[in-house]
Amino acid sequence: MTSRNYLLLTPGPLTTSRTVKEAMLFDSCTWDDDYNIGVVEQIRQQLTALATASEGYTSVLLQGSGSYAVEAVLGSALGPQDKVLIVSNGAYGARMVEMAGLMGIAHHAYDCGEVARPDVQAIDAILNVDPTISHIAMVHSETTTGMLNPIDEVGALAHRYGKTYIVDAMSSFGGIPMDIAALHIDYLISSANKCIQGVPGFAFVIAREQKLAACKGRSRSLSLDLYAQWRCMEDNHGKWRFTSPTHTVLAFAQALKELAKEGGVAARHQRYQQNQRSLVAGMRALGFNTLLDDELHSPIITAFYSPEDPQYRFSEFYRRLKEQGFVIYPGKVSQSDCFRIGNIGEVYAADITALLTAIRTAMYWTK
């Protein structure tokens, strides 16, 4: 295992490499060409290339967490006459519904429950009876449960019905192969501190340029105006409208180099997938059960039912694991008592093996 205080087994922020951390030791000037052209513009080009080889796409970086970018897209992509169908089966789909409500955006929330895969036929039926829907928005990897949602099938519906398609790929982009043009995605949203394995500080949107250009004057926010941010970066060669998170950006540039060195998204996906499978097999051997069936799991994070033993307390389990150098995630499912373990970031097979040994030691309720 790499040198660290402890291993973050979370869906981001996550454990980063020493070299990603070291990239932040340099101070950059936000108006300097070495930074804007040499770093920011290179990142924008690399992100677009990771998303698709098709022409007509661009990328925008935005200060803040991933939710800032989700709100920027919803607040900029939808005009007063538009309506969005939000497919929700977890906390992050529900957050989009909340955002739309607060911004006064017309929306239809299709909530299929936290442990159910969205029913594509039901989505088809909603689109068929409501022609006022102009946009579809959904989460790809719903980290509430660890479920991977069917963005390909919903994308086919968006294309067939002529709807603008927004995908929150926060914890999947860079870790799961995808071609956003083939998936008919118009806006893909992700964050620096997820599968690219950078650190928190900014999010990004990869968008169909024609769609983004139509957002002029629509934003319901000054700071979260996606069109204005894009035009500033386009017109000023990587310049951010407001203070750029320079150290985070330098870390992200290094993280992109390390993604390429690993073998790209396909190789990283293979590592994540093997991590997750080994984790589930080991946890089941220790007596834990997964919340979801195997075919629903993403290779990003897994939810496990909490032990039914009356002595079990998550806080104590967490403390004992942290003492051994491992940090896991509490549950977020409303109807079940669970905890979650992520396996993305600078996490390898040996780390999963060591984690399982630590979990066995931390199972105080079995002793």
Swiss-Prot record:
GO MF annotation: an example: 2-aminoethylphosphonate-pyruvate transaminase activity
ATP-binding keyword on record: no
Catalytic activity: (2-aminoethyl)phosphonate + pyruvate = phosphonoacetaldehyde + L-alanine
Keyword line: Aminotransferase, Pyridoxal phosphate, Pyruvate, Transferase
Top class in the EC scheme: transferase
Single Gene Ontology BP annotation: organic phosphonate catabolic process
InterPro entries assigned: Aminotrans_V_dom (IPR000192), NH2EtPonate_pyrv_transaminase (IPR012703), PyrdxlP-dep_Trfase (IPR015424), PyrdxlP-dep_Trfase_major (IPR015421), PyrdxlP-dep_Trfase_small (IPR015422), SP_NH2Trfase/AEP_transaminase (IPR024169)
Cofactor: pyridoxal 5'-phosphate
Residues where N6-(pyridoxal phosphate)lysine is found: K194
Protein's UniProt keywords contain Mitochondrion: no
Role noted for this protein: Involved in phosphonate degradation.
NCBIfam families linked: PhnW-AepZ, PRK13479.1, transamin_PhnW
Record's subunit section: Homodimer.
HAMAP family: PhnW_aminotrans_5
PANTHER family: 2-AMINOETHYLPHOSPHONATE--PYRUVATE TRANSAMINASE (PTHR42778:SF1)
Protein family according to the UniProt entry: Belongs to the class-V pyridoxal-phosphate-dependent aminotransferase family. PhnW subfamily.
Protein name: 2-aminoethylphosphonate--pyruvate transaminase
Organism listed in the record: Salmonella paratyphi A (strain AKU_12601)
